[in-house]
Amino acid sequence: ALPELVKAVVSEQNGLAAPNINLKKDCVILFQGDSITDGGRNKESNDCNTLPQLGNGYALFTATQLLKTHADKQLKIYNRGISGHKVFQLRDRWETDALTFVPDVLSILIGVNDYWHTLSSGYKGTVGIYENDLRDLLKYTKEKLPNVQLVLCEPFAVKGGSAIDEPRWFPMFDAYRIALKKLAGEFNAVFVPFQSAFDAASKLAPARYWAADGVHPDLPGRQLMADVWLEATGLK
């Protein structure tokens, strides 16, 4: 069943030596990324731990579990994902949308648009640009916040989704996933294996059950992402 699947995927991808996240009292957790993180959040809200501010995506599903399980820590959880964004757009808003929060835990999911928009929008980026831009952003972040705990989430595309024309996506998109995992190792970040989780889950139910378009997860896909994130970070 799904809990065993999640454990198996994380164990297989991360091994025994993977870093875990440590939470302290009043810990600030920030989710960053694109539309998958955004989840239709209210961008006028600056509150933490609220439905409008957290959106309705995996960040909300993850936050509710964290707030319940770690109630004694009085966590402060924020979401600053913005739909459509690629790495260079993260960098453009990094001061106000990341560093000013002084997060103790910073979770980043970025990459699907860095590839998808080369197919759909004429974007001229490459996997090399993606990797180098993200590496530079992570270096800068660690310079400014040397004690931040990083969580790097694997970009994913659910095979069989309506927006995923497999011959145009694979194996090319795999290079972005490989680059992200490489960076997780370089920065001693927690790696969250979303692609592997969706690949495994698609053997239990078809792709359209998890993410109809293959990019934006539906309700069970959002919960799956939350479960994988919590398993990978050791915070379940």
Predicted regions and their residues:
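Alpha-helical cap/lid subdomain in secreted, periplasmic
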Residues: 23, 56-76, 85, 89-236
